[in-house]
Amino acid sequence: MAVVSLSEMMEAGAHFGHQTRRWNPKMSRYIYSARNGVHIIDLVKTAVCMNSAYKWTRGAARSGKRFLFVGTKKQASEVVAQEAIRCGASYVNQRWLGGMLTNWTTMKARIDRLKDLERMESSGAIAMRPKKEGAVLRRELERLQKYLGGLKGMRRLPDVVVLVDQRRETNAVLEARKLDIPLVSMLDTNCDPDLCEIPIPCNDDAVRSVQLVLGRLADAINEGRHGPNE
């Protein structure tokens, strides 16, 4: 049985690519045609890729792999957090900070600082500080929560990165590849399929398309960890 149907993808607008002048020729194998100056993605091939991605992701989850969802564009941000939380993955959905993977020791120290500040806030320790000092600590807490809140459960580097919008998340791609962390990537027609291990050709700008793909990948992770009936 297919992981996702052609009608579901059509309804989500997953077949709409970018303007033909903005394409990457390496994506030609996944393009069906062009209409009104816009490339149309071959959803039959997308369905095949989704099946492969689902099976691969489920297998990785079954073997205990840890996942990091990355997508910082406005229309993907909420979905990234929602689906990552649903399957117990970590996530980055506001801004990719340089060194999040390649400078993990420093990043982990900042995550630990976030946890310390949250403990101080919940215990009332910040409220007991002088007003000015308390305000400084709360601003630091808010900033760390915004950018690192999705990483609090990540005690070490992820085994797999799930990516929305390869072009926007260039630094995340480079860091993952430098560390040989496999990438499961949504690929629009302006992307490079050679820069990921598990490609999913589809519209990475439409919220419904992002929701559909990440939702299925989250399902795969949950199935791998808990079984299909849990």
From Swiss-Prot:
The record, for Pfam families, names: Ribosomal_S2
Tell me the Gene Ontology biological-process terms attached to this UniProt entry.
translation
* Keywords from the UniProt entry: Ribonucleoprotein, Ribosomal protein
Give the molecular function GO annotations. structural constituent of ribosome
The family database entries (CDD domains) matched by this protein are listed as: RPS2 (cd01425)
Which superkingdom heads the taxonomic lineage of this protein's source? Bacteria
Q: Which GO terms describe its cellular component?
A: cytosolic small ribosomal subunit
Q: Does the keyword NAD apply?
A: no
Q: Which NCBIfam families match?
A: rpsB_bact
The entry sums up its family as follows: Belongs to the universal ribosomal protein uS2 family.
This one is known as Small ribosomal subunit protein uS2
| Organism, as annotated | Prochlorococcus marinus (strain NATL2A)
